[in-house]
Amino acid sequence: MERKVAELELGLFTSGYQRYPLEQAFEDASRFGYDYIELWGGYPHAYVEDLTARGVGEIDRLIQKYRMPVKCFTPEHNGYPFNYMAGDEFQWERSMVYLEKAIELTAAWGAPMMLFSAGHAGVSDDRT
């Protein structure tokens, strides 16, 4: 029985470019033949609160200039100040607002998915 293999797409995750201008990641993705960008949502490129305040115009410009879609947004949220697995109820609620903003931003540039991972609750916290 012949099995068909789904077409593979390769994305460039921008976290490794955090010490470079974001445009460098888009330029490299285009130059090296990547299919899409997985945009890391941390400083200095795509931090959720900054994008909420400034808008997504710069990212839209890069998408258009390099014809390189953002197919996944990965907001930074496993460290201070946002980690929904640690802290008190206030921190949890604040983290939820942050992640809701991230979902809205993901939709703003048409990315079909947002990736986030479970944070760490800490070794001394009682979670029973």
Regions found by a protein language model. Give the residues of each.
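Glycine-rich, proline-tolerant flexible connector loops at the mouths of alpha/beta enzymes
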Residues: E38-K65, A118-D125
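Residue-level recognition of alpha-helix initiation/capping sites
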Residues: R19-Y20, A53-R54, V97
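Aromatic-lined carbohydrate-binding surfaces of glycoside hydrolases
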Residues: H77-P81
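Hydrophobic faces of well-ordered beta-strands that scaffold small-molecule active sites
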Residues: L8-S15, D35-L39, M68-P75, M114-F116
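Acidic (Asp/Glu)-rich catalytic clusters
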Residues: E2-A6, F26-F32, L51-T74, E100-G110
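Active-site acidic/histidine proton-transfer and metal-coordination neighborhood
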Residues: E23, L62-Y66, F82-T128
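Short beta->alpha connector loops
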Residues: G16-Y20, Y43
